[in-house]
Regions:
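Extracellular adhesion/carbohydrate-binding repeat motifs centered on closely spaced tryptophans
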Residues: 1-316
Length: 316
């Protein structure tokens, strides 16, 4: 009848509000649905007994087992035609987040979710969307989350001029994290760490940063500090003390590596770091030190140097 199609059973009775051959749907008027969403409850005659949202294309056929752009949003449909939602890992291993059961649109850009990260993401699991204080993910224009290829590795991406790192589950790195798989060149392992700010920051630190987050308190389960032995006179080192609990100045190069006291330091120049024409001393945990400090040579003699009156200075 015109542009509409109707289904008649063997007795000539027109079908209404039901699925036909698990492929088409006719509405209350009996007309075949096209270019529209259809909701079906559980235990209905829908192609999936779980119910959910289904989409009928321009020819009235239910969309199945594919991605489809609808009204400028990207949706995924399973083999039964049911719209996917929540977390989704597709056949090629790409990770997406599709909102709740009444949404389904693949997210793009930054998204903060209530996610503990202990067991990864289950397909169909819905996470609460937060304004902050949760776990941040970044989804590309095609909806794919940026994430590392394997466990205990990180993928990095420059976004709006800042470098971010993401683990195998797509979670943005925060705090002190070992992301580069570098060999340590110091007494504690600080040379393998970078700093990525608080829970709602994530930018890799460069230049000077005053931090209350101590690197010894890293949440990186795959990292542990070694004992600090650089003050041993037989190795050469600095005579100084540190009281925990306070903040400290750190300096990070363009690759995010903090300045630190190298175990190879055997001289005043080797034990300090030049920044903007001045020399500074950073201890085995990367903390800048100030005041009068003594460098202990391998032969036990001490060379003293003055590094400013307080922590706001530190220049030799």
């Amino acid at each position: 009848s015109g542009a509409n199609y109707y289904y008649l059973d063997s007795d000539g009775v027109m079908a209404r509000s039901q699925w036909i051959d698990d492929t088409y749907y006719v509405g209350s008027s009996g007309a075949r649905a096209s270019n529209r969403w259809v909701w079906a409850g559980e235990d209905s005659d829908a192609p999936s007994s779980d119910g959910g949202w289904f989409y009928l294309d321009a020819n009235g056929r239910m969309v199945t087992d594919t991605w489809r752009v609808i009204n400028d949003h990207r949706y995924h449909f399973d083999s039964d035609g049911r719209m996917s939602y929540g977390w989704l890992t597709d056949e090629d291993g790409s990770l997406y987040y599709l909102g709740d059961e009444n949404d389904g649109a693949a997210r793009t850009g930054w998204l903060c979710l209530d996610y503990d990260g202990e067991y990864g993401q289950e397909d169909g699991e819905v996470a609460a969307v937060l304004s902050g204080g949760g776990t941040w993910f970044y989804f590309q224009e095609n909806g794919r989350a940026i994430r590392a290829a394997g466990e205990n590795t990180y993928a990095n991406r420059t976004i709006n001029g800042y470098r971010y790192y993401f683990d195998e589950n797509g979670a943005m790195a925060t705090g002190w994290v070992s992301v580069g798989n570098r060999e340590a060149n110091d007494a504690t392992g600080i040379s393998t760490l970078e700093y990525f700010g608080g829970a709602d920051e994530g930018q890799m630190a460069r230049g000077w940063r005053y931090l209350y987050d101590d690197p010894e308190d890293t949440d990186d389960e795959d990292f542990s500090f070694g004992p600090a032995t650089s003050s041993d006179a037989s190795h050469g080192g600095w005579a100084h003390d540190y009281e925990g609990g306070d903040g400290a100045w750190y300096y990070f190069d363009n690759n995010g590596t903090p300045a630190y006291l190298s175990t190879a330091a055997q001289s005043l120049s080797g034990a300090t770091t030049r920044v903007d024409g001045h020399r500074y001393f950073f201890d085995e945990y990367g903390r800048m030190k100030s005041g009068l400090l003594g460098f202990v040579r391998a032969d036990g003699t001490v060379v003293s140097a003055y590094f400013g009156a307080d922590d706001s200075d530190g220049a030799m």
